[in-house]
Amino acid sequence: MPLNEFSLIEHYFSAIGQADGVMLGVGDDGALLDIPAGQHLVVSVDTLVAGVHFPPDAAPDDIARRALRVNLSDLAAMGATPRWFTLALTLPGADMNWLKAFSRALAADAERFGCALVGGDTTAGPLTISIQVMGLVPSGRALTRVGARAGDYVFVTGTLGEGAAALQLFDPSVELAGSVRERLKERFYQPTPRLREGLALRGLASAALDVSDGLLADLGHIAEQSALGADLELSALPVAPWLKKLADAGTVQDWVLSGGDDYELCFTVPAENLAAIDGMIVGGELIATCIGRMTPNTGIRCINGNGMSVQVEQTGYRHF
């Protein structure tokens, strides 16, 4: 595809989203952004490749939503408010219908989550989407993976396992009921970045991250960064009732512990902040479950309903 055809893309991406602080956005060599005093800039980037992170024939609107949301999840994990993002788009061909659907979905989500596209790049090649998100957090208030202490309580938002279960959508040998298929499709392409929850946890959580690589792996990151371990209560893991009916208990446990792609927040809470977190949960301000505690020993121990440590095979995150 001749590269000059990419001039058509300006029509679709020149005005996506609105946010304060954009002094100069799409159309120049770079964006000029105003960072308010007393705020830190949080920056994260993820790349999605067709055939690796989503099916090559996925609908463009689905791709757009997934690409932006998985990036925004990183901002949520740091307690940041989304402001701006850039887009690097590699396309195998200039399909105007594809671009229209992709840009409309991207614009809708940018509006929903309060961020603006401020720049990017386009080129020809295999379908690849790279999005860099930028957000703001008050100085000294960012949530990070470092800071957990022995005895801290481990929590996770929402429910787990649905992101990994969604891979069944792309297995032709698996038959799924229509309602289940729609739930899994929504979970895969439209994960909800826990931005509101991230803001609520500022000043209360000692460490946090989003569950993208699997609960065991991601909780392991918190433990490693703090030179600690954790005891994980298997019976406390939050699983949607409908998901439990989708496969045998062992498979569901594998989805929950190792599957990844859930984009929930895993966070630790010191004992002195536990009452505040419990109050938010009881009051409906936060949907989260206590699933264990940090320990002075290294490694993650999985504890069954009888209080016994059990060996759990960690299969690890699987790409599409």
What kind of region is each of these model predictions?
Residues L75-W84, G114-A124:
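Short, flexible active-site-proximal loops enriched in glycine and acidic residues
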Residues D20-V22, A31, A107, V118-T122, ...:
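A generic local secondary-structure boundary/capping motif
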Residues M1-A59, M78, R83, L87:
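Extreme N-terminal cap/leader segments of soluble proteins
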